[in-house]
């Protein structure tokens, strides 16, 4: 039975404005993971990174910052800074499959170098001032790599091991390897969290049926595509047209304020959200094409209004249960 639901970090989507506005309308999430930042070699935070992790902006939400690096020294520096801000946990990103990231040996690219990863963990867990959780994939090339990775993870007191059951080269395509996740669940010495392809209540319930001992999940794209998903998993109601209209208006205004009145930039941020949210609606194919191509904020506002007025919410996500 699922007891804990984490909001996964989606780079470019679940930033500070989105997290704050989303939390005002929906619910059911226990923790919000802040999209990763990479410490600079000079141990400085960029203004953009500082804005995201500034504890003043996150203290009202239970938040966990995520760090992506292959340098133990840089990671430890980041942990010291985050502890001083008030955070009580730091998450290490070993899951990002982006080619620009993995080419530098970071994210899931670090999984291709287990000896270096072991040295990293040796230093981090001997000196770290905060509990460290890890978000990982099964490996870099093949799922069979995970057995050795799990042996490595079991040597350290990882606060929580979040497993996305794909390898780097699969990115987010193809079926997840639930047989390998079963091995993680059975053999991990650390708490395990499941992440991957949870978009409906039905998919979460199917996961619970197959793995009755799973109590912790992390959901990202599913909570953007159906903002009421976590609430429904807690027994609450699905979303409706009015709630979505109010949420999107508040989000658009939030982006406009954040970008100091630059409405064009705010509309671009909304386009990114609609990449996922459009799947909540039936009969929206034509308007979705327009969403991808709009050039002005006025065009965006017209298209969104037409979707909300004319496209029905999909019947399989509208109710409390699926």
Residues of each region from the PLM?
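Active-site beta-loop-alpha junctions enriched in small/polar residues
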Residues: 10-12, 37-39, 68-70, 95-97, ...
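Short glycine-enriched, charge-decorated loop/helix-capping segments at active-site entrances
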Residues: 105-111, 170, 234-235
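Short, charged, surface-exposed secondary-structure boundary motifs
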Residues: 42-44, 171, 226-232
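Glycine-rich, positively charged N-terminal anion/phosphate-binding segment
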Residues: 10-81
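N-terminal small/glycine-rich loop or linker at the start of catalytic domains
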Residues: 1-4, 40-62, 96, 101-104, ...
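Alpha/beta catalytic cores of nucleotide-metabolism and tRNA/nucleoside-modifying enzymes
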Residues: 1, 5-6, 11, 16-17, ...
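Alpha/beta enzyme core
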Residues: 21-26, 76-90, 94-104, 115-190
